[in-house]
Amino acid sequence: MSPSPDHSATVTALTIAGSDPSGGAGIQADMKAMSALGAYAMSVITALTAQSTRGVTGVHAVPVDFVRLQLDTLLEEDIVPDATKIGMLATAELADAVGEYLPGLARTVLDPVMVATSGDRLLDEEAVGAVRRLCTGADLITPNLHEAAVLLDEQPAASLDGLRTQAQRLRDLGARRVLVKGGHLIGDAGDAVDVYADADGVEILRARRVATGNTHGTGCTLSSAIASLRPRRATWLEAVRDAKDYLTGAIGHADALGVGHGHGPVHHFYRIWTSEGE
């Protein structure tokens, strides 16, 4: 009889999020990033979207009972992930249901998807309130400028100091660790600037700003990269830094990927693929 396989070295990462048929965002982006960074990726689908690189035309929330069934079947009967990323939760009921599982999950990263790239709100106030509650149970939250403002019920930060203040305020509201993504906020040197805050203080994270319109799924990619790296890094900050470095490279190679006729996806496999496809 063959010996039982040793799975101790296999990092497992779960994404709880919506589906993007174009493959650039949602669970598709999550699983690509996790796989590219050496984790075994798994998924629980919370919503089906009709979207492409040109935009979203529809969202169908998966019934709460079926989301619970997916989670129970995976977690109770088979695999407990080493890390979990949580993304799109379209309704308050979904957010509250997923929140019930947080105490049993390790290394949880919440990407509070609430605002579209256009700046339009994707969730009603009841759902926003449920996501706020979820923020206090996750190990790390990764809102962008607009999402941080929605969580705090104030205007988006217009400066680095404002970004720092909002990160600290999110911590004051109960979030354990916060990474506020600066997005289009211009740093002192035109860098892409994010702010990380935890119990030890605040860190300003800078990376070169890449000039490209192909940025579909950047938030999904970053949060799932952090989750997949955290089990193999000594600290959350180290995982965040390495994930940000990976994302910068993925954005930098996005134009070479050349997929779609709108805002194309980043290149999740830029470290693996070659021009010959080997």
Model-predicted segments: where are they?
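Short, small-residue alpha-helix embedded
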Residues: 33, 149-150, 213-236
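Acidic-glycine-rich active-site phosphate/pyrophosphate-binding loop
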Residues: 2-10, 26, 189-205
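Charged C-terminal helix
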Residues: 10, 58-61, 77, 237-278
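Short beta-strands and strand-loop turn motifs
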Residues: 15, 81-83, 109-116, 142-151, ...
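Phosphate-handling active-site elements
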Residues: 37-42, 203, 229-243
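Short pre-catalytic strand/loop immediately N-terminal to key active-site residues, enriched for Gly-Thr
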Residues: 16-22, 202-216
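Conserved N-terminal subdomain of the carbohydrate kinase-like
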Residues: 2-15, 31-117
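Conserved phosphate/ATP/ADP-binding segment of small-molecule kinases
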Residues: 125-202
